[in-house]
Amino acid sequence: MTDKSQQFASDNYSGICPEAWAAMEEANHGHQRAYGDDEWTARASDQFRKLFETDCEVFFAFNGTAANSLALSSLCQSYHSVICSETAHVETDECGAPEFFSNGSKLLVARTENGKLTPESIREVALKRQDIHYPKPRVVTLTQATEVGSIYTPEEIRAISVTCKELGLNLHMDGARFSNACAFLGCSPADLTWKAGVDVLCFGGTKNGMAVGEAILFFNHKLAEDFDYRCKQAGQLASKMRFLSAPWVGILENDAWLKYARHANHCAQLLAELVSDIPGVELMFPVQANGVFLQLSEPAIAALTAKGWRFYTFIGNGGARFMCSWDTEEERVRELARDIREVMSRN
C-alpha cells in the first residue's frame, strides 16, 4: 500500500533516511565535546576528504541559504559582485541573504541555456562595465543541478573555470542537489568540483535524506581563512555540532547519499516516461536530476490540486514542477501519472 502522504512539491517534504537517523541515534549516546570539537564532526570531515580525494576545509551549516550566503561572503568584498543565473536560488529564494552577509555584494544576472551559465554569458556580464562606478565582478556561482533540473558536465565546468581564471573570478557551486548530479553523470565528486576548477562547494544534505544540514567545502584553503568566525557570527556554529555532522557520517560511509540520489533520479525519469505520450503535456526541460517540469493546461493544474496533489507552479503559466525524493515510491509516481492523464483528457 502506498503512502498517500507522499507529495511532489519539494524534495524537502520527505523525512530522514535510515542511515542518517541511525547515525543521529548513535551520536546521542554519552557526552561529546561541543562546538564541533567532537569525534562525529571529525569523522564527517574525513569522509568528505576521502570522497573528494583531497584535503579540503570542511564546515557545517544548518541550511542552504546560510551555506551559500556565508560561502559567497568569504569570496567577496562589499563593493564586489556575484554573477549568477536568473533562476539561481541565491537570486530568487534567499531573501537577500547573500547581499546581507557580504555587506552589499550585488548579484548580477547572466543569461542561461537550459538554466546553465556559459563562458560567453559570464564574459558578457563581467566585461559589461569595468569602471569604478560599477560593482566589480569577483565570483561566479553555479547551481548543480540547476533550478530547472539541468546538469553541468565536467567539461562545461572546466570551460567556465578557465573563463573565471582569465577574468580573476572565484567559482562557487551551490550543490543543494549535487548528489543528483553525481548520480546522473556517473562522475566522481572530485571530477565535478576541484578537478574542474571549483573553489567552494555547498553540498546539500537536506534534500537527500537528512533532516537538516549542509556542508561547505573549500578546495582553496586560503579562501577558508576565518570562515569559522563567519559561521559563528551568523549563528551557524551549532553547540551540539555532532547532530549536524553525524547524519553525514551515516550517508557518506556506505554511499547511501548516492543510492538515494539515484533512486530520486529514477523516479523522475519514470514520471517523465509515463506522461510522455499524453496529448497536451510537454516537458519544459530535459529530465536529468530528480525534477520533472511539465507544461499543463491551467484547468488540469487546478484539477490536480483539487485531487490533493501538491506541486509548485512558479515557472510560468501552465508550468508545473514535480520533485522526487530519496523515498519516493514508484506506485505513487504511477498514481500521479494516471491522474495527470485523466485531468488532461478532461481539460
Where are these regions (language model features)?
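Conserved PLP-enzyme active-site core in the AAT-like
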Residues: 2-285, 289-307, 313-328, 336-346
